[in-house]
Amino acid sequence: MKFYKNNIKIDGVADDEELRCAFNNVKVILKRNMIKYQTKYPEEHAEKMRYTFDRFFLDAWHGGCWCGMYWMMYEAFHEMPFKRYAEELCLQYYELINSQSIWHTDIGILFLPMCVPDMRFNRSKEAKEALVLAADCFLTKCAANVQNENSKEFLTDKQVKNPNGKKSGFNDLRKNMGGKISNLNNILILMFAEKITGNRKYTSAGENILYNVLKNNIDNSGRAFFKYSSGKKFDDTSLFDLEAHGGYTRAQAWALWGLSNLYTRLGSEKVYNYFFKCFDYLEKASCGKTVLKYCICGSDGDYDDSTSTAIVLCSILEFIKSLPEESCEYKKLMKGAKRYMSGLLQCAAKPEELTEGLLDRGFILHATHEERGVKTSATVSGDYFYVEALMRCLYNWQPYWD
């Protein structure tokens, strides 16, 4: 495998042929998925690797991931069906944000993978407007608590309702308003909004959010906590005793992804130090696993989490662009990248599984724990970050939030 850094090849663990085979498998599956879904979105979690239609329509953050995969396939293979479907999927979200019918605390990862390629390939005015509206939506509906470190208030039922009087699906903002580690990702959409409008208010808000997330969601050991509220750090699940198992891996993954993207854009020494603090904690606590567990210190037989593995791999591949190849930090991150890519390839769909009759399936196994105990489910977000990792490895790819 070879990684690419500004057209410079970086030695890895396997050859290009293995990665291209995996990438072509993704293309085959996505083409078949297009036959079924066309301009509709699937549920985030598959059941036995099979996706079903989204009961909540578009009120879900993984919509950006689904659309983003189509954009990456178009960029890699220049096949127009991928572009046409991506454009049609984008329009549905543009209409929602224009009518202010979508309020989401993960709005950054929702809109960036769909809007930015639309701007890049089509110079879309609608995409620019949607990005700014999404940033405004985040600031007015979701960011008040994370900008104010002393705020302990949550939205009321009345405020949670959208203009049509309906509650926002599973996006219960009262539950999610506590400072989330994933708000690091929302800073990116604020930076984009300032780039488009020239209005300093967006990055000013982003700076406040960054300060509070670093202060409240990451402890001195480097462990990241999914949420912070009412003066307490806590994780996003009651399924496991996370205190006894080193914490919640997904929170650690989101911390690394947000910090890596912010560092390549800000060059902040503080962000640099926090990234390595979080990375070192994960490496030590996970004991060098090729596929991370749902709990950071999980042992063999516990739930795998290939989605978090893919997010961490993409974080490494983003951060490593800023490091000199001879540095110890570069070598440490590359060692982790090799291990995680090896693990993801083992979780990926195999060519012999790609029969003509198998539509609507995901790409990687063990992407979600699922409360009912399904250990082999795929998720849209896990699939997206797996595709992004392959894209970063095979192409001199410019991320859609650059």
Give names to the regions the model predicted.
Residues M1-D402:
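Glycan-recognition and catalytic cores of secretory/periplasmic carbohydrate-active enzymes
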